[in-house]
Amino acid sequence: MLKEKYGFKEVEDKCNILWEGSKVYRWNGEKDNTFTIDTPPPTISGKLHIGHIFSYCHTDFIARFQRMLGKDVFYPIGFDDNGLPTERLVEQTYKTRAKEVGREKLIEMCHEVIEKSKQEFKELFKSVGISYDWDLEYHTISKETVTLSQMSFIDLYNKGYAYRKMQPILWDPVDKTAIAQAEIEDKVFESSLNTIVFSTEENEQINIATTRPELLPACVAVFCHPEDARYTHLIGKTTVVPITETKVPIIADDKVKIDKGTGLVMCCTFGDELDIYWQQKHNLPMKIIIDQDGRMSLHSVHGQKEEIWIPVSGHWDDTIGATGMTGERATQMTKEGGCDQKEEWIPVSATRMTDDILNEINGLKVTAARKRIIEILTEKGLLVESTNISHSVKCAERSGAPLEILPTYQWFIKTLEQKAQILDKVKECNWHPSNMRKRMEVWIEGLNWDWCISRQRYFGVPFPAWYSKRKGEEGKIILAEIKALPIDPSKDLPKGYSKEEIIPDQDVMDTWATSSITPQLSALAVNSEFSLPNHRYDTIFPADLRSQSHEIIRTWAFYTILKAHYHANSLPWKNIMISGWCLADDKKKMSKSKGNIITPHIILETYGADVVRYWAANSRLGVDTVYSENTFKIGKRLVTKLWNASKFVSMFMEKHQVMSINSAHETMDKWILSKLYKVIERATNNLLQFEYCEALGAIEEFFWKDFCDSYLELVKKRAYGSSEATLSAKQSLAYVLNVILRLFAPFLPYITEEIYHQLYSYNSVHNQSNWPSKEELIYDKYSEEMGDNVIQILNIIRKIKADNNVSVKHLIKKLMIKADLRKDKLDQSAQNDLQAVCNAETIEWMQSELETEDEKYIVNIDLY
């Protein structure tokens, strides 16, 4: 017999020890029978909240199902512990900034913090019953991962997919690093639309509206639409930029929107992507007036003969600021090998502001400079109007800072030239749900930039590259030898070069550059050419499943598909399963920065792991779910009911008895077995399509409606006897509960394991090949229909008793049933169970012709 009450804390502790000791989740390396899961490695950026647990449970439902189905499941756990998120955690933990402690000290601090965080993550994953094979654990800053990441980079470089170039990139002035297009988010800011007076060479005043007047010193042209009749007479002329008094051309271009603002637009080189497009199309000068700290950086040409230069190719080192250098310094860099020739440095026109205004603006943060420029324009009578507006601004996803566009040296991976091929790969993959594929396609079609993979940070995978200063090969890129990996170019030297002959690459890889090869990290190989010893590439690549949430389709999913295509002309996985978000009560994504997170430890302590998993399973694939305490309460009821139903069944069976349904011959027993046949079929098909929510729904409905509410009540009296009918009931009860436990096992692993151990076997319910098969059963259509008729009559009787305010056990003197006796009369076996459950002394059948299938029976009762 089971205990009176289920104690989840005691059971969870016992099961965790059991599972760890028995290695029930271990991957055995069966090449032809492996089911490989590409697991999302959590970012080491702080504590996990209930929203994280939500999505990790979804993957575990599939892992447990596939294991029980008979597959040798490869289910690793990784920790994404390199990169900017970890640096941010260190800065928050130690109340410092990376640049204050220096590179070496920061890296040391990062290692200390991630060790503590990883232990907390491990304990949480184990406490919620995630069935990882912990022997397959990996880390994105480990020696093996760094080696594979550097192999990946070298392979892409050798194939011409990775390149280094000076070009405008998205720059985060808070974290002081380049970021990729996929790492931006749009935020709404309060701002002002400022209409400013420009003057043409004929002293005609023209008005231009802008939200960024601080960029006036960078204005290199004014644009109008070629068909805008208001301004066609100005095309080809020049205008004077306010404050700077610089003359710039007025140019026609069809990308100008006639109905936006005044119809005139100033081009400021690096204001936005359209500015860059115009600069390149019309061969305009380049002016860089914002530095990497997000401050105004202006250079006066008064009394200065030489020009300011910026490099467009070659090596960029710390002696070169974001605003360029003088021609003398450019020549010096050429001699040192920083670039191949002086023609690779482009002159930048400096501002012609008066020195007093320049000195006042120089060094200000962008927002402060904007405010002061507006004041100066007002003082000079050059501001027509300033209107308050709300508008969308591109910001860094992590820091939240508004982005600038700066030309700097970065490493890139080609994406734009391979759009069509990547779209083909996307279509080859099976998307669950299928509509999520469209998100990926829209993202790829909208790409405007190649993937910038270099970051100006410290704690990450270094690029295995140096730049030669040797005479005759100045600026040459030197890559590490594969056998020398992993390397740190700031400490190691390339073969055949001295320290004086090279400049090490100081950047680190974007953390997505490593996360995008998680299938290969698990395989210990990038492809068949680049691998570690004892790799398992041929066994587990490509993976069977990638599970992730929808907001990283544009990053993790896209980059992983891109790299697998480049490395092996392959998909990284056959299926991708997309989870929605767990939303807070305010219907916003849970986020520590928003202050709306819920700590999983509190929920686990209150309800237990199975209830938390039940809550997670009640969300449909790809659909955002609002956190609901009510779902936890329903889950708790289910766990309690499963325990109590099992207690009842245990009264009619011997411990660990042999399962058999050979004697199950009574109609209602064959009815429940036929219903069980269908639910096994339905749940299996749902889980094969990764539809865990639908699978749980089918199992739960069967358990509550068919098994508990109907079958247990119908056979209760019969199970207490000693006849053949009793044996039929006992065998059916024991068998059906056994299957129910196995069906619930992927979702409720703890309580099912405990009951299974107590009643059926010392082996784990989660063992390989323990998923129930409908082939064990025989579907009996006659018994199912007969049983459904019993349930229909029983429900009518229950309603009549309720309407008469008597208990369901109240004795019925006579039960009178009208039906079409030629086809709807119950057989004797079914009638016996009905008579017992409704407590009727006699049943009288009467012929009746009824119209609809839903109203087969008219029931009347005589009560005592």
From Swiss-Prot:
Binding-site residues for ATP, renumbered to this chain: K592
Known EC number: 6.1.1.9
InterPro entries, sorted: aa-tRNA-synth_I_CS, aa-tRNA-synth_Ia, Anticodon_Ia_Val, M/V/L/I-tRNA-synth_anticd-bd, Rossmann-like_a/b/a_fold, tRNAsynth_Ia_anticodon-bd, Val/Leu/Ile-tRNA-synth_edit, Valine-tRNA_ligase_type_2
Cysteine pairs bridged by disulfides in the record: none
Keywords: Aminoacyl-tRNA synthetase, ATP-binding, Cytoplasm, Ligase, Nucleotide-binding, Protein biosynthesis
Keyword Ribosomal protein among UniProt keywords: no
Residue span of motif 'KMSKS' region: 589-593
Superkingdom as given in the UniProt entry: Bacteria
Domain remark from Swiss-Prot or TrEMBL: ValRS has two distinct active sites: one for aminoacylation and one for editing. The misactivated threonine is translocated from the active site to the editing site.
Protein family membership: Belongs to the class-I aminoacyl-tRNA synthetase family. ValS type 2 subfamily.
Quaternary structure note: Monomer.
Identification of the protein by name: Valine--tRNA ligase
Organism in which the protein naturally occurs: Wolbachia pipientis wMel
